[in-house]
Amino acid sequence: MKQARQPAEREGGGVEQKTSSRSRYSMRCNMANCVSAHILIGGRLARSRYPELIEAIKADNPAVDWDGTPFDPDDIPVGKPLALMDHDVANGCFEEIEGICHRHGLHYVRWSGASPGSFPSVRIVYTGNGEPQPVLTTEEDEQVFSIERIRKLGSIETIEADYQRARRNPPPLVIVDDQPADVVILEITHG
């Protein structure tokens, strides 16, 4: 019969508990409103910063599809944004991932479902600088315009422009070398 592994004793007394990133994430969800959410990430990221993004993804623990397929750091999408999702996202926000995007100027669009009585379904658009822009949506990620918003925007053209801005996806995620390729400088001789 296999015995359960006992937690290790910590220096100075007490027991050290080992937790996986999934169980740490589950603990956060037990203390927060958890909803479905997905995020698209794009822009240019220096290769030396890619490990930071990987660690943030591990911390938030999303998948690459709704079936829960884990993210593989070697599978960077070609020609499109990185898509990540999960059914149990604390407060509908990928905190670590979004923090890395803010620090490194990466674009993202995040949609999260509503938590009745706490917060509405929303799409967040971040273009790599400034503040993330919230857009009210349905549970199917369709933009909702309140009468106040319609009045503020004023014309059908302005409403359509606002709609297009909110529906725009980030550019592809591109990992770039930190140092540009060696540049050969030709010396011009004056004669």
Show which residues each predicted segment covers.
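The N-terminal extracellular segments of secreted preproproteins, especially immediately downstream
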Residues: 12-13, 28, 100
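Charged interaction segments
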Residues: 78-191
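Glycine-centered flexibility motif
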Residues: 1, 32, 37, 41-43, ...
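Polar/charged alpha-helical tracts
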Residues: 48-55, 59, 69, 74, ...
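N-terminal interaction modules that seed assembly of large macromolecular complexes
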Residues: 55-90, 95
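Positively charged N-terminal leader segments that act as targeting/secretion signals
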Residues: 2-14, 21
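Short, extreme N-terminal segment that most often corresponds to the first beta-strand
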Residues: 22-65, 190-191
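Intrinsically disordered/low-complexity terminal segments and short unstructured peptides
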Residues: 18-19, 188
